[in-house]
């Protein structure tokens, strides 16, 4: 199995409710190491750039508004098959369809306020990590 890195965001709906520690516990229980983490306030231009792939989708404006509504925690996670492992612990985008014990099933408020983001592929992870972290901030 391959040791990979992936990118995670703990979204404003979760940070607002002080769930960072509980979410980190689920991440670590899944066998992933948190090798970089910081709390930031995303600006509108940052959110629009980060979610540019969704620009033409009807939910784009609401997504950007949600992401700038409060602080987020951005993270780099590392472990065996980290991208899949994190997406598994994150759960389905719709919390009603997420498996019990996943971040979204346990903590999400709705599809729009679903507590987390995770990279969907190694290429995406590399781009997302580089957008939020410099090399010396990642200590693995």
Swiss-Prot record:
HAMAP family: NDP_kinase (MF_00451). Pfam families: NDK. GO terms for molecular function: ATP binding; metal ion binding; nucleoside diphosphate kinase activity. GO terms for cellular component: cytoplasm. Its main location: cytoplasm. Homotetramer. This is Nucleoside diphosphate kinase. The active site is at residue 117. Belongs to the NDK family. It catalyses: a 2'-deoxyribonucleoside 5'-diphosphate + ATP = a 2'-deoxyribonucleoside 5'-triphosphate + ADP; a ribonucleoside 5'-diphosphate + ATP = a ribonucleoside 5'-triphosphate + ADP. It is found in: Cytoplasm.
């Amino acid at each position: 199995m391959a040791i990979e890195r992936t990118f995670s965001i703990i979204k404003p709906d979760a940070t607002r409710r002080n769930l960072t520690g509980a979410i980190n516990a689920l991440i670590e229980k899944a066998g992933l190491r948190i090798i970089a983490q910081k709390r930031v306030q995303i600006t509108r231009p940052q959110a629009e750039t980060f979610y540019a792939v969704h620009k033409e989708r009807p939910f784009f404006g609401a997504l950007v508004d949600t992401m700038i509504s409060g602080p987020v925690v951005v993270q780099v996670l590392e472990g065996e098959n980290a991208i899949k492992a994190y997406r598994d612990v994150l759960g389905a985008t719709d919390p009603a369809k997420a498996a019990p014990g996943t971040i979204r099933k346990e903590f999400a408020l709705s599809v729009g306020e679903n507590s987390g983001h995770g990279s969907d592929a190694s290429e995406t992870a590399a781009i997302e990590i580089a957008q939020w972290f410099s090399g010396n901030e990642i200590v693995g």
